[in-house]
Design a protein with these regions (language model features):
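Short linear Ser/Thr-Pro motifs
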Residues: 6, 113-115, 419
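Extracellular/oxidizing-compartment recognition motifs
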Residues: 11-222, 250, 270-275
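Sec-dependent N-terminal signal peptides
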Residues: 3-11
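Active-site lumenal/periplasmic loops and adjacent helix-entry segments of GT-C-fold
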Residues: 228
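Active-site core of glycosidic bond-cleaving carbohydrate-active enzymes
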Residues: 231-536
Length: 536
């Protein structure tokens, strides 16, 4: 029924005549979920600690899980269960009568969380510009003890906090067990971890794999706590890591088809798709950087699978994304970011004034090369003959207008802003190569005034640019410091936002709503597998 609703949606609004068929293809590639039953490994107690990440840590409690699960419940008690790993799925609470019989409902507040501070920071007054509804706390009224209660809401996290809000004194009952049905479509890892990794890199590798595994559901989600949806930019990075881990290419195919089928009225990809109750796009979310990364995902999918039928089927979508991007390019071969109202996302540092014009110029050049490569593999270069010439002219225009030969860096926008992202994308696009690339990256990274990356997403591209520029020792050090910093601060899965110098950084103005298991942060596996000689 839901799939039908979705098909109806595309039939009535589709830009591409094959959209309804594409949606069926997406359904046909939907993976099954694997289930793992998890139980808590220990009880923990929170401690405010300004040396801990975001000011809170958990210590082992002297009470065992079985002692906690036989304690008569009384209002005011708080139990915190530690499951020892990050999980995505469904929580079941079991209660058991210990003495006499139930004479009043039991009232509990349960909360799942990924990080200690998320469970211990007061949430009111709510400070984020995202909904309070993302927090995973629920009030339960249990009318019948001795019956399992399974929460219908899917949750994500490692810790479960149960507060007793109301319990009768005239009978005793205990929270006899808590279990968690953890789900993921990832399955077994198909690729072995390289043998020669240092202990620190091994730890980073493990956390990366866990991050991707948790985000692999019936789509690649960005974060299983939040936003629980499919974003094109996250998909690109996830698909790269999937190659070197679970190799579930059907999931990538499903996601490519969903974006194509649910494109906007003008054929551009909508940046993100919400899967439930039926797949639908977040109407109006037009983000050109992610439109173009969809092309790269299709190219990488083709390289991984050799599935030319799918790539041929979807080629027109890739071409449409490219045409749309080229419509912003003026006679001077500069991408005009003000031409239309569009979201150009490279990093959440956009809230701190990151200027994206130079990075967008470069991202367009990179996309032209990638789309041309796709056309070449599909025998369709005759349709895009002009691409290499445009890319060459855009490269020259970037050097002419944005490159400061004296300082050896790319400046962005009218204020001539210096940022690491501008250099990164210029290197990725081949606008800066060799010694010039090294100089630009080194200068921006060392300059305190330059805008540094604020997310693992942006950092991924920095590490990639370093490798491309031949700064291999620096790339290894940067990756180890950045992702290793999260591991040292207790990450079981990698976080959405991370600044080594600011544990409270939040793109949403309130850190508890940040996602601590975030797709775009899982890429160390990609680097360690793709460049074994660099990361060992
Ligand atoms: C965030 C999402 C996602 C990202 C977009 C731009 O809210 O979590 O990961 O791709 O924004």
């Amino acid at each position: 029924m839901n799939a039908l609703l979705s098909i109806l949606l595309v039939v009535t609004s589709a830009f591409y005549p094959q959209s309804a068929k594409w949606l069926e293809q997406a359904e046909a590639s939907k993976p099954a979920l694997h289930h793992t039953l998890c139980t808590p490994v220990r009880m923990v107690e929170p401690h405010a600690d300004n040396t801990a990440f975001q000011g809170w840590r958990y210590d082992a409690s002297p009470v065992t899980v079985s002692e906690a699960c036989s304690t008569p419940l009384r209002a005011g008690q708080v139990f915190t269960f530690d499951f020892g790993r990050h999980m995505v799925g469904y929580l079941t609470l079991n209660t058991r009568t210990l003495r006499r019989c139930q004479d009043a409902p039991l009232r509990l507040r349960v909360m799942m969380g990924e990080l200690p501070a998320e469970l211990n920071t007061p949430l009111e007054p709510w400070g984020a510009w995202l909904s309070r509804g993302w927090m995973q706390d629920e009030v339960l009224t249990i009318e019948q003890v001795d019956q399992p209660v399974t929460l219908s809401r899917r949750m994500a996290g490692r810790y479960l906090k149960v507060e007793v809000l109301g319990a009768s004194k005239d009978f005793d009952c205990a929270l006899s067990s808590v279990t968690f049905d953890a789900v993921s479509s990832a399955g077994e890892e198909q690729v072995r971890m390289p043998d020669n990794l240092s202990d620190e890199l091994q730890a980073i590798y493990r956390v990366s794999v866990a991050t991707l595994q948790e985000c692999m559901q019936t789509v690649y989600e960005d974060g299983p706590k939040r936003d629980r949806r499919l974003w094109s930019g996250d998909l690109y990075l996830q698909s790269l890591v999937n190659r070197y881990s679970f190799r579930n290419f059907d999931l990538t195919k499903r996601c490519l088809y969903l974006f194509a089928a649910l494109a906007a009225d003008d054929g551009t990809i909508i940046s993100n798709i919400i899967e439930q109750p039926y797949p639908h796009p977040q109407i109006g979310s037009y983000m050109i950087t992610y439109c173009l990364l969809w092309n790269s995902t299709l190219l990488e999918y083709l390289i991984d699978t050799g599935d030319t039928a799918t790539a041929q089927d979807l080629w027109q979508v890739a071409k449409r994304q490219m045409e749309d991007a080229l419509s912003y390019v003026g006679e001077d071969y500069i991408f005009d970011i003000h031409k239309r109202d569009v979201w150009i996302f490279f990093d959440w540092r956009e809230h701190e004034g990151l200027d994206v014009s130079a990075a967008m110029q470069a991202a367009t050049v990179f996309a032209i090369d990638q789309t041309y490569d796709l056309a070449r593999r599909l025998g369709r270069t005759n349709e895009v003959k002009h691409y290499p010439d445009i890319a060459a002219k855009m490269r020259r225009a970037a050097i002419r207008q944005m490159y400061d030969a004296k300082r050896g860096v790319i400046f962005s926008g009218p204020e001539r802003q210096l940022s690491v992202q501008s250099q990164t994308w210029a290197v990725k696009a081949g606008i800066l190569t060799g010694a010039k690339a090294r100089k630009a990256l080194t200068t921006a990274l060392a300059d305190r005034q330059a805008i540094q990356p604020g997310t693992p997403y942006a950092t991924h591209y920095v590490v990639e640019a370093m490798v491309l520029a031949g700064m291999t020792a620096e790339a290894r050090e940067y990756l180890t410091d950045y992702w290793g910093g999260m591991v040292r601060k207790g990450a079981d899965t990698f976080w959405e936002a991370y600044d080594p110098n600011n544990d409270y950084l939040s793109p949403y103005d309130f850190f508890p709503v940040n996602s601590a298991c975030h797709a775009w942060s899982c890429t160390p596996v990609y680097f360690m597998q793709k460049y074994p000689e660099v990361f060992k």
